[in-house]
Amino acid sequence: MVDNKLFPTFPTPVILYNFGKDSHDLNVSLVNDILKERKSDDDGRVASNMGGWHSILKMEDRYDSFKTLRDKIEECSNDYCRQTGHEDGLIVEKLWANISGPADINMPHHHGASALTGVYYPLYEMVDGEMKVQYQENPKLLPGSWDGKRGGSVVFHDPVYGQKIRLRKTKDVSPFTIEHYHLYPVS
């Protein structure tokens, strides 16, 4: 099992799992497979992303690296259930990848029928054509790292965000053209 740290600050506890240096080969494989997938499907799909690239779902069916990651996530997900007093036996599926650059964002959203959702960040930088990865023994959740070198902000939203709202029908509206959201309660 990987190192983990429970943050019981929220009604739904957050646990940070650190795979550390042992995940180096997996990280290299994941990044290479993600870049290979992007090369084969440069447009990707549009979901909550505004800018950036979003792969197809079920990457674990296409790449061994994602199958390995899925197994690790499934182990951590069931550990999360045990630590927080829930029944384990979760099955992890439908993994995907996002590539985001400067000014790319993902709009707040929820993942429908998912029991848990999480994110795995294989952060790296290319130096002289070689992938370099820094591993921290005790990473901290630090919202507001705006320099782009350590990733973006961590923002927590209410898990039921958007479930009982609707957007008024307006001509020519898409996630890329709308300037204001007008939210109306659904009774």
Stretches found by the model and what they are:
Residues 19, 43, 50-51, 88, ...:
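Feature targets compositionally biased, intrinsically disordered low-complexity regions
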Residues 94-186:
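Catalytic core of non-heme Fe(II) oxygenases with the double-stranded beta-helix
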Residues 1-84, 105:
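Non-heme Fe(II)/2-oxoglutarate
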Residues 85-95:
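A short coil-to-beta-strand element that immediately follows conserved catalytic motifs
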